[in-house]
């Protein structure tokens, strides 16, 4: 009987704790939103954005302390991937066209858990966390955001929130491309040769540190003025793309086990020749036509066109003894758990180029849109809310 009563009391307390935030909170919050796709002038600040609520028992509400911006935010502002994102948000097409608006951008979040769904076991209100938010969900340029429990992870203890917000999206992207698609991990990377095309941006600066921490030899392409940065992060060889044709410079080096391409364009016409043939070597590109195809042709035809395109390239390169793959962002709290350990162990550090205030979100977008990044652009949100 005593055990039963303890279980009942515990259950009631857990139930109350999980939803205590809902009972007393407001129904609106400050946020930056867009009401249509376009250029920077579509960004609008509002104090009346709908405050997010838990819809599924595995979700958590996070109070945003800092948000990170990524090139995907610039693309999404202009409508890139709208067809695919709409399908992910509304698989049955119940909502009318434009049902995603007002849309909140921002893929990185670092903050504090305020509320947990009933199935969330590893987090509690008050936990300091970070997460990479999938593009089909409402983003982090707001006071609060809802994420799934399997997307969130405890923030590294050694980082401030504005530092932590620079890592999750690029870490999840690099992890998906290098580990899930490329096949490298901490146990098999020693002495492997890795080439990172475009090493000074967000994904590149993280990928350098991760594979270097795993014992790989890292070669990076970047401009001359980014060489010091990438060498400080662990790059062994640096190729300056402003000093002449990159492919000619790279052909003078030993061949590679893995190439991570964050540049796209003409690179895949010559980069696969830099791989070690018949050794399982892989070329993984993050620049794919998948979302462009679905936007242009519709979901079904776009997916078919993408399958044909990648299939032809896979077969063509298999004949040469190398593997061609597309890499994609994949949210993963478990991957961020491992990254958090690497950060606290001093093996990975944040690379923040500039921090903007919440009032400066349009300026932050302009900074990312200019390109030639030397790390990440971050928006500090919690400090503005205190004022």
UniProtKB/Swiss-Prot annotation:
Keyword NADP found: yes
Pathway membership, UniProt: Cofactor biosynthesis; ubiquinone biosynthesis
One GO cellular component term: mitochondrial outer membrane
Pfam (any one): ADH_N
Gene Ontology terms: biological process: eye photoreceptor cell development; regulation of dendrite development; retina layer formation
Catalysed reaction, written as an equation: a 3-demethylubiquinone + NADH + 2 H(+) = a 3-demethylubiquinol + NAD(+); a 3-demethylubiquinone + NADPH + 2 H(+) = a 3-demethylubiquinol + NADP(+); 3-demethylubiquinone-10 + NADH + 2 H(+) = 3-demethylubiquinol-10 + NAD(+); 3-demethylubiquinone-10 + NADPH + 2 H(+) = 3-demethylubiquinol-10 + NADP(+)
Domain of life per record: Eukaryota
GO molecular function annotation: oxidoreductase activity
InterPro entries per the UniProt record, alphabetical: ADH-like_N, GroES-like_sf, NAD(P)-bd_dom_sf, PKS_ER, RTN4I1, YIM1/Zinc_Alcohol_DH_Fams
List of residues binding NADPH: 200, 202-203, 223, 241, 286, 327, 329, 372-374
Keyword Metal-binding: no
PANTHER family found in the cross-reference section: ALCOHOL DEHYDROGENASE RELATED, RETICULON-4-INTERACTING PROTEIN 1, MITOCHONDRIAL
Function: NAD(P)H oxidoreductase involved in the ubiquinone biosynthetic pathway. Required for the O-methyltransferase activity of COQ3. Able to catalyze the oxidoreduction of 3-demethylubiquinone into 3-demethylubiquinol in vitro. However, it is unclear if 3-demethylubiquinone constitutes a substrate in vivo. May also play a role in the regulation of retinal ganglion cell (RGC) neurite outgrowth, and hence in the development of the inner retina and optic nerve.
Protein name according to UniProt: NAD(P)H oxidoreductase RTN4IP1, mitochondrial
Organism: Danio rerio
């Amino acid at each position: 009987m005593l055990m039963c009563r303890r279980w009942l009391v515990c259950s009631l307390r857990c139930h109350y704790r999980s939803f205590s935030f809902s009972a007393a909170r407001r129904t609106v919050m400050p946020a930056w939103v867009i009401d249509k796709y376009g250029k920077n002038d579509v960004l609008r600040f509002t104090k009346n954005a709908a405050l997010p609520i838990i819809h599924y028992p595995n979700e958590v509400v996070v109070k945003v302390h800092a948000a990170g911006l990524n090139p995907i935010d610039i693309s999404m502002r202009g409508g890139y991937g709208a067809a695919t994102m709409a399908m992910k948000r509304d698989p049955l097409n119940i909502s009318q066209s434009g049902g995603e608006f007002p849309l909140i951008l921002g893929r990185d979040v670092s903050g504090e858990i305020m509320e947990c769904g009933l199935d969330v076991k590893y987090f509690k209100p008050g936990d300091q966390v970070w997460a990479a938010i999938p593009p089909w969900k409402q983003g982090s340029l707001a006071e609060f955001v809802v994420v799934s429990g399997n997307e969130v992870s405890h923030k590294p203890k050694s980082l401030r929130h504005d530092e932590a917000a620079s890592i999750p999206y690029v870490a999840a992207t690099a992890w998906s491309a290098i580990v899930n698609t490329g096949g490298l991990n901490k146990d098999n990377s020693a002495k492997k040769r890795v080439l990172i095309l475009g090493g000074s941006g967000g994904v590149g600066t993280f990928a350098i540190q991760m594979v270097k921490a795993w014992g790989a030899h890292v070669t990076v392409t970047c401009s001359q003025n980014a060489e010091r940065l990438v060498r400080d992060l662990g790059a062994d060889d640096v190729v300056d793309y402003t000093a002449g044709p990159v492919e000619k410079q790279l052909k003078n080096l030993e061949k590679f086990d893995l190439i991570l391409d964050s540049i796209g364009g003409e690179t895949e016409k010559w980069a696969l020749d830099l791989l070690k043939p018949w050794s399982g070597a892989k070329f993984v590109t993050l620049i794919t036509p998948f979302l462009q195809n679905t936007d242009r042709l519709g979901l079904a035809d776009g997916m078919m066109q993408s399958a044909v395109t990648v299939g032809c390239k896979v077969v063509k390169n298999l004949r040469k003894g190398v593997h061609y793959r597309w890499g994609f962002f994949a949210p993963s709290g478990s991957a961020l758990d491992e990254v958090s350990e690497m950060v606290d162990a001093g093996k990975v550090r944040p690379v923040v180029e500039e921090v903007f205030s919440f009032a400066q979100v349009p300026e932050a977008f302009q900074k990312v849109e200019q390109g030639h990044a030397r790390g990440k652009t971050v928006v500090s949100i919690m400090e503005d809310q205190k004022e």
